[in-house]
C-alpha cells in the first residue's frame, strides 16, 4: 500500500499484507499498532477487524499524530507516545489484554524525505533527528556537548562503524573552530565531515549511512524503547495473541530474535545452569511463546520499494 499523507508525501508500507495476516487471528480483538507512521498498517488492520474489534496506535512523531486524525473510525484510537509506554497508556484505557501487537520499527519515507527533520544525509537540513519534535535534545545539541569518547561509542555501537573514533575526533575538532566552521548544525555538514573521516567506502553505501543511523538511534532511545516495548507487548498478550515485529537493521533484529527465543526456548537460556545441576531440568518454565517464523520482502516488493530490502519480520504467538 502506498499512502498519500495529508502533507502530500508518499509512503510505501513494508510487508503490509504479510504483517496484517500474521497479526489478525480473530476480528473482535483489541490490537496494537506500535508505530502508526503514515497509517498503512493501521488502515489495513481496521479493514480486517469486525464491529467488535478495536485498534490502539502509538507514535512519537507529531506529523504521524496529525495523519492519524484523518482516520474516521470509532474503533480506532491514537496515543502520542512511544510504544515503550504501552502499559501505562493501556492501563489508562482499562485494557488488560490484547489479541496482538505489531511493531514496525522502520523510519517512514516522509521522515527521510523531509529535509527539515534532519534524518537524511542526502539533503541539507537542520541536524535534528528527533522523532518527537516537541521534546528532547536534537542531534546537533548532543554533538555540541557530548564527550569525544561518548560520541565514538554511540557511532560504534549503534552504527557498527569501524571509523567511529576518527569521526568522533573530527566532530570534536570542528567544535573548536570559529565562525561558519563551528559546531555542526546541518546534515550536509555532518555528511561532509564523515566522508572525509571514513577512509574506505562500502560498495553502494554512502559513508555517512552508519553515523546517521547511530545518531538517530541514540537521540530517540530506539533500542531501549524496543526492549521495553517488547516486554510490555508480551505482558499484555492474551493466550493465542500474536507479536509481530518488523526490523530494518541487525541491531534491532538481534534484540527481537533474542527476546522471542528466550521465551520460546527457555532451556537454552538455562543451559549453563543445567550443566551444573542437571536434575533441575524438570524445574524449567514451560515455553511462553511459539515461534511462527521469519519473513523477508519478496523480490517484487523490493523492486517496487528498495527501502524494504533490509526488512525482517518475526512472528510469535503467546502460549
UniProtKB/Swiss-Prot annotation:
One of its GO terms (molecular function) is rRNA (cytosine-N4-)-methyltransferase activity. S-adenosyl-L-methionine binds at residues 39-41, 59, 83, 104, 111. It is an enzyme of class 2 (transferase). It is found in: Cytoplasm. GO terms for cellular component: cytoplasm. Its EC number is 2.1.1.199. GO terms for biological process: rRNA base methylation. Keywords: Cytoplasm, Methyltransferase, rRNA processing, S-adenosyl-L-methionine, Transferase. Disulfide bonds: none annotated. It catalyses: cytidine(1402) in 16S rRNA + S-adenosyl-L-methionine = N(4)-methylcytidine(1402) in 16S rRNA + S-adenosyl-L-homocysteine + H(+). Specifically methylates the N4 position of cytidine in position 1402 (C1402) of 16S rRNA. PANTHER family: 12S RRNA N4-METHYLCYTIDINE METHYLTRANSFERASE, S-ADENOSYL-METHYLTRANSFERASE MRAW. This is Ribosomal RNA small subunit methyltransferase H.
Amino acid at each position: 500500500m502506498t499512502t498519500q499523507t495529508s502533507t502530500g508525501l508518499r509512503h510505501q508500507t513494508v510487508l503490509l499484507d504479510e504483517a496484517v495476516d500474521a497479526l489478525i487471528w480473530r476480528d473482535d480483538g483489541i490490537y496494537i499498532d506500535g508505530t502508526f507512521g503514515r497509517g498503512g498498517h493501521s488502515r489495513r488492520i481496521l479493514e480486517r477487524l469486525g464491529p467488535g474489534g478495536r485498534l490502539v496506535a502509538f507514535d512519537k512523531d507529531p506529523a504521524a499524530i496529525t495523519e492519524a486524525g484523518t482516520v474516521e473510525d470509532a474503533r480506532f484510537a491514537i496515543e502520542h507516545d512511544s510504544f515503550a509506554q504501552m502499559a501505562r497508556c493501556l492501563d489508562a484505557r482499562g485494557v488488560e489484554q490484547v489479541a496482538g501487537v505489531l511493531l514496525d520499527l522502520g523510519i517512514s519515507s516522509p521522515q527521510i524525505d523531509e529535509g527539515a527533520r534532519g534524518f537524511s544525509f542526502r539533503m541539507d537540513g537542520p541536524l535534528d533527528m528527533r522523532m518527537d519534535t516537541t521534546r528532547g535534545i536534537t542531534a546537533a545539541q548532543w554533538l555540541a556537548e557530548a564527550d569525544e569518547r561518548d560520541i565514538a561509542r554511540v557511532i560504534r555501537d549503534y552504527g557498527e562503524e569501524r571509523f567511529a573514533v576518527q569521526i568522533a575526533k573530527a566532530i570534536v575538532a570542528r567544535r573548536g573552530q570559529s565562525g561558519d566552521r563551528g559546531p555542526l548544525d546541518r546534515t550536509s555538514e555532518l555528511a561532509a565531515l564523515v566522508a572525509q573521516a571514513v577512509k574506505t567506502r562500502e560498495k553502494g553505501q554512502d559513508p555517512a549511512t552508519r553515523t546517521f543511523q547511530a545518531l538517530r538511534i541514540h537521540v530517540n532511545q530506539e533500542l531501549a524503547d524496543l526492549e521495553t516495548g517488547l516486554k510490555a507487548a508480551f505482558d499484555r498478550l492474551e493466550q493465542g495473541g500474536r507479536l509481530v515485529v518488523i526490523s530494518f537493521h541487525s541491531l534491532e533484529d538481534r534484540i527481537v530474535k533474542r527476546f522471542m527465543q528466550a521465551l520460546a526456548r527457555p532451556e537454552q537460556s538455562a543451559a549453563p545452569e543445567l550443566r551444573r545441576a542437571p536434575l533441575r531440568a524438570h524445574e524449567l518454565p514451560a515455553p511462553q511463546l511459539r515461534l511462527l517464523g521469519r519473513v523477508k520482502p519478496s523480490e517484487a516488493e523490493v523492486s517496487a520499494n528498495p527501502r524494504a530490502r533490509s526488512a525482517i519480520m518475526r512472528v510469535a504467538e503467546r502460549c
